[in-house]
Amino acid sequence: MDIDPYSVLGVEKDASDELIRRAYRKKALQHHPDRIHDEEKKVEARIEFDKVAIAYGVLSDKKRRKHYDKTGQLRETDADIDFDWKEWLDELYQGVVSGETLNEFKASYQYSEEEKCDVLKAYEKGKGSMDVILEEVMCCEISDEDRFRQVINNAIKDGKISKYKRFAPNEKKRKRRAKAAEREAQEAEELSMELGLDENLKKRRKAGASDEEALSALIRSRQKSRMYNLISNLESKYSKSSTKPKKSKKSRSKE
């Protein structure tokens, strides 16, 4: 998978480690397949999520980042072939959806200028469709609709954006969204029982874990098969590279 990690995360080449971590968290949550309801878009989200995971893997490691800056190659050296991508990606996928990460990001993101900008971008993208806005903006729920409408109405009043007909309140659509959200919550609960996670989730809640933290266990399990597909592709690509004759230290010193 040939990508530009800086472009994928949306950061400049001189971005600090902290900025890269923040960009990674935002992109990972934004493209997480389990926050997408449309099945076709879910496939696209998985592809983007994989790119984000790889980009962060390069830029979060000083040696890989330095090597990429010099050569434009994602793989560091021949020795990097032995890197345990499976273990690293497993930890990465789990870290993205941990309750702590979600709560931390949500606390800093909601009501921020960054969220307001994302709301307005989603408004423009959907031509005023609240369905699109709630689908695009991270960490939001049905209950955020009135708050988002206030943000958008203020921007319209200030002349920053134009008003679309689709933005007009529609009680019928609001009820439909509420029913859809209730149905998805029920499906998630049924899936947790099917996967044998329901008892684990109950124990987490009894132990004082938040709903988001408990649900993260379910999300991680659903991501397992996706993760291993990515790992297989990476290992296949790297194993082909490893068949090439390795240069001796002497020959490398001449280059």
Swiss-Prot record:
Region (Disordered): 167-215, 230-255
Composition skew (Basic residues), residue ranges: 167-178, 243-255
J domain boundaries: 4-72
SMART domains assigned: DnaJ
InterPro entries tied to this protein: DnaJ_domain, HTH_DNAJC9, J_dom_sf, J_domain-containing_protein
Any one annotated GO CC term: nucleolus
Chaperone recorded as keyword: yes
GO terms assigned for molecular function: heat shock protein binding; Hsp70 protein binding
Intracellular or extracellular location(s): Nucleus, Nucleolus
Pfam families: DnaJ, HTH_DNAJC9
Classification via CDD domains: DnaJ
Annotated keywords: Chaperone, Nucleus
Similarity-based family: Belongs to the DnaJ family.
Name this polypeptide is given: Uncharacterized J domain-containing protein SPAC1071.09c
